[in-house]
Amino acid sequence: MRTGMAGKEQKSYIAIDLKSFYASVECKERKLDPMTTNLVVADKSRTEKTICLAVSPSLKSYGIPGRARLFEVVQKVKEVNKRRICMAPGKKFAGASVDNEEIKLHPELELDYITAVPRMALYMKCSTEIYNIYLKYVAPEDIHVYSIDEVFMDVTDYLNTYRMTARELAGKIIREIQQETSIAATAGIGTNLYLCKVAMDIVAKHIEPDQNGVRIAELTEISYRKLLWAHQPITDFWRVGPGYAKKLAEVGLFTMGDVARCSLGKPGEYYNEDLLYRLFGVNAELLIDHAWGWEPCTIADVKAYKPENNSMGAGQVLHCPYNFEQTKIVVKEMIDQLALDLVDKRLVTDQIVLTIGYDIKNLEQGTKKNVGEITTDWYGRKLPKHAHGTANLKQHTSSSRLMTQAGVKLYHEIVNPDLLIRRITMAANHVISEKEVQEEQQYEQMNLFTDFGIAKKEKEEKNEKLEREKKMQKAMLDIKKKYGKNAILKGMNLQEDGTAMERNRQIGGHKA
């Protein structure tokens, strides 16, 4: 058994990322090479402002980011072709190609690309096939699925069994993925979860592939400090977003090495860990640990974690700005679906949370609206501040009727009826199982003036009404599961401004 400096067993973790996963699946379906085919996964029927789910590696080589908006792809390809036509014989294109190797060899060809409509069910099927490959080598309790295209594996106890190093095992798994699915992958290996993630995200992207075309990077705490303490931008590191980077830059910290040195400062010095805690609160502890390459959390810890408060919800971006009454239809649909989800999972809630995001068109010149407080979005655009509120229910429930009553009342209380709306987020808080509610002791305040016979009868009638509604909800779920989500609908779903029917054809907000 290998041991670390503190006498503890030294762990071996592998992180695997499927390269441009959605784009690679689309290329595979078309029998095209994912590494040389210019392809984006995006629904162009949603206008060119739609975000691309994936961009193939060859198209990325022209400076297109992985999560570009479609209009950015269109603009960049136009720029490339503007330069190419100057070098084309007779300043004229003889044709077009989506094959990047062909484009490199033939200056007379126009750069072209495929726009593939998202097919989420297909991607989930392929991801499941790849997960089954992981299971050939590692037990499910030692795998953490981070996303549809990324996993972490604790391979500590497998290396002696397979008589392999972590690098050899990672290479074997990746080669099998490529042979079985034609999808390329990269891997990071580390002595903790953070290091394997950073090795994959940063180091593997900048190394040459091995003889099999596979990129695998390894990091230990020491090699991490040598290689990455000076790395910029700091946003390349896991969990360091633009907000963190901005706060750090304002106090003169630009790298993980800077953060690590700051944490060593003595009391009374400007740069010390107190500065980081003032900036980030308790999150500073995690940032300092990561700056040093430390991460105590294991996959077993991740699997065992149970949050103190459970919630579930959904959000959607409307395809065009909706007015107050139009949005109310969608809010009611979302509450109804949330109630069905609770019934399906045998859960109940006692609080609804609603967030409404307004559209930037509310601030267009010539509009005379009381927009209230103005804020700035992620893209630096001015827009009215979102509306947010909670509605407490009198009891834990999954009743669509009770939840809708509370949700619509909340909607009227918090939303500005004069403004156009673009985003809706609906959540159920304090979610617990039906069994937990049944086990809870119920208390009631007694008084001399209540007719408890009438009160008991009213309570029984109320419970009967709720039970009838639940039976109806369960029947609807059975029909939807057997014949499809649109097999049974409510009248409101057939209204022109309803979105439920279209959402039912989607997975994760994208076409199934």
Walk through the language-model features, giving the residues of each.
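Short aromatic/hydrophobic contact patches that present stacked aromatics
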Residues: 152, 392, 425
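DNA-contacting surface of Y-family translesion DNA polymerases
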Residues: 6-8, 15, 236, 242-421, ...
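Gly/Gly-Pro- and Ser/Thr-rich, intrinsically disordered tail segments characteristic of DNA damage-repair
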Residues: 1-299, 448, 455-512
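Hydrophobic, well-ordered secondary-structure elements that form the walls
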Residues: 354, 426, 484
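Short, internal active-site loops enriched in acidic
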Residues: 156-158, 191-196, 356-363, 429-435, ...
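C-terminal hydrophobic structural anchor segments
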Residues: 409, 413-478
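Generic "edge-of-domain/loop-turn" microfeature
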Residues: 46, 160, 194, 317, ...
